[in-house]
Amino acid sequence: MMDWNNKNVVYVGGFSGFGYQVCQMMMKKPMKHLIVCSRMENVEMLKKLQAINTSVKVMFVQMNIADYASIVKGVKQVIGHVGHVDVLINGVGGLADKDVETTVAVNLTGLINTTLMFMPYMDKTQSGHGGMVVSISSVYGLEPGPAFSVYSAAKHGGIGFTRSMADEHLYHKTGVAFMCICPAMTSTELMMNKRDMNWMKWVPHSEEMWKMVMDAKMQTPEECAVNMMTAMEQAKNGAIYICSTSGMKEITPTVYMH
């Protein structure tokens, strides 16, 4: 089970949706620091987080994970403040298939670069104490997403990265557990902004598929956050969880080579 006591937690993500809801829930834990890394600062949201628990120091570091130099600068600032990281939550996501490079950068390469740059400050054989990396993916990282194939491909890649980093040999060396959380359809700002079908017209034959996606029953960010916290509390290396209106469920991907 996860021990939150005196931990330095880094959340890389925005100030809306289930990621921010998770931050609110984590603030009730006996952490030492919560550092929010995002492209834009939201002073009011940071104040609301701090008000939940004045014993946990809330900090903000600007970081754009689609920009390698910004990640380098952001990680340096974080480590300058706290020295090491115990929990890293990769919570950035972007659904904009028309912009292939940005979609891949936000959902895959940014996640990889951010994780690898923080690893020396988590790895117990280097400057860290061990810990946990939690990457927020999507059910469309587990199954095809024909209405948004680029997004789906990037999320598949993120899960592949997580599973590879969770290798037992690496885990025993570094002390860093890796897990992935895959929310099902959630009524976040990311999804609600896509109700205008015009944005999908550049993808041939996608309108009907996208309508089916948007007509599906969605969980609220609050429901998703509760399930995510339950999953994180398990602190199980290599675990992949689906969070949906049905609750939280651990899944086991097929292994083809032994």
UniProtKB/Swiss-Prot annotation:
Record keywords, A-Z: Oxidoreductase
Single GO MF descriptor: alcohol dehydrogenase (NAD+) activity
Active site: 151
Pfam family, one: adh_short
Family (UniProt): Belongs to the short-chain dehydrogenases/reductases (SDR) family.
Coiled coil: none
Sites where the protein binds NAD(+): 10-34
Highest taxon listed in the record's lineage: Eukaryota
Keyword NAD: no
GO CC annotation: cytoplasm
Protein name per UniProt: Development-specific 25 kDa protein
Positions of substrate binding: 138
Provenance organism: Sarcophaga peregrina
